[in-house]
């Protein structure tokens, strides 16, 4: 019956079940602000503290979102540079001149950075399985937004296989089944 050393060791002989209850009457921290008659200053101070805490929460969330965007753009630029280095290595193996190599590498870099695929951030990272937690987070948010915009029919179509096909007739209309 004892929990963390609180309460009876055993309920035997005590005439009780040994159930332990928390005494919330003695806790003054949980009194609501409206019931607090200690004064206007104290209520206003508590209200301001809540507002500051909320503002701090919003600012940290915005900072995290900005950091995620910066990381994604850095990953994108890094992939572009990897492709440029691969081209440079291939051209150096073919014994091209340095000026020609620089020109071709710069053309490829400009092409990759200015392409519409890159602008939409859909590079080779999206083609393969994403190793980046930030990319998977962005995809999850986009999927969630798409689901929010779905119509009622789309939502009904997304029910599980068992529910869709076992409770419907040949025309796809729901059967009234009592369970």
Curated annotation (Swiss-Prot):
InterPro entries: CWC21 (IPR051372), mRNA_splic_Cwf21_dom (IPR013170). Residues 1-26 have a biased composition (Polar residues). Residues 59-157 form a coiled coil. Residues 27-39, 46-72, 123-132, 140-155 have a biased composition (Basic and acidic residues). Residues 72-115 form the CWF21 domain. It is found in: Cytoplasm; Nucleus. Transmembrane segments: none annotated. CDD domains: cwf21_CWC21-like. Keywords: Coiled coil, Cytoplasm, mRNA processing, mRNA splicing, Nucleus, Spliceosome. GO terms for biological process: mRNA processing; RNA splicing. GO terms for cellular component: cytoplasm; spliceosomal complex. It comes from the Eukaryota. The keyword Coiled coil applies. Residues 1-72, 113-159 are annotated as: Disordered. Associates with the NTC complex (or PRP19-associated complex). The NTC complex associates with the spliceosome after the release of the U1 and U4 snRNAs and forms the CWC spliceosome subcomplex reminiscent of a late-stage spliceosome. Belongs to the CWC21 family. Involved in pre-mRNA splicing. May function at or prior to the first catalytic step of splicing at the catalytic center of the spliceosome. May do so by stabilizing the catalytic center or the position of the RNA substrate. This is Pre-mRNA-splicing factor CWC21.
